[in-house]
């Protein structure tokens, strides 16, 4: 498995009435890191005929992040085949897992928005290096 990593710093806009990072912020970060990783994986390859659409999110909140915390986000591609690809994301604070997520993406045709089988070229991009 090839792990992609980035960092986030908790800002005032991320904090909710419970004085910790709001669950919707983690969802945004999941989307952000998925996009960053996909951009890196497809570098130099024209994939404009396709788009990924989320069909399921599963998120486990194990700990919390507070104002000013530095959060390390890690993602990797899991089981992929047919029209679906599973992406795993984990968030760490001080090397301790605080959020774990799994997102199921469906590949769709960019013009028709109909699900389409994942091409061999895309499978190769997603395969562990």
Annotate each predicted stretch with a short phrase.
Residues 1-72, 79-129:
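Terminal targeting signals and extreme-terminal segments of soluble enzymes
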């Amino acid at each position: 498995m090839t792990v992609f990593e980035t960092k986030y710093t908790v800002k005032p806009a991320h904090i909710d009435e419970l004085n910790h990072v709001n669950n919707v912020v983690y969802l945004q970060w999941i989307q952000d890191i998925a996009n960053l990783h996909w951009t890196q994986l497809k570098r130099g390859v024209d994939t404009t005929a396709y788009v990924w659409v989320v069909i399921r999110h599963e998120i486990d909140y194990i700990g919390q992040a507070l104002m000013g915390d530095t959060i390390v986000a890690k993602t990797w591609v899991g089981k992929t085949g047919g029209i679906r690809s599973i992406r795993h994301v984990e968030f760490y604070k001080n090397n301790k897992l605080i959020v774990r997520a799994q997102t199921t993406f469906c590949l769709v045709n960019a013009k028709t928005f109909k699900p389409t089988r994942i091409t061999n070229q895309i499978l190769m991009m997603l395969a562990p290096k």
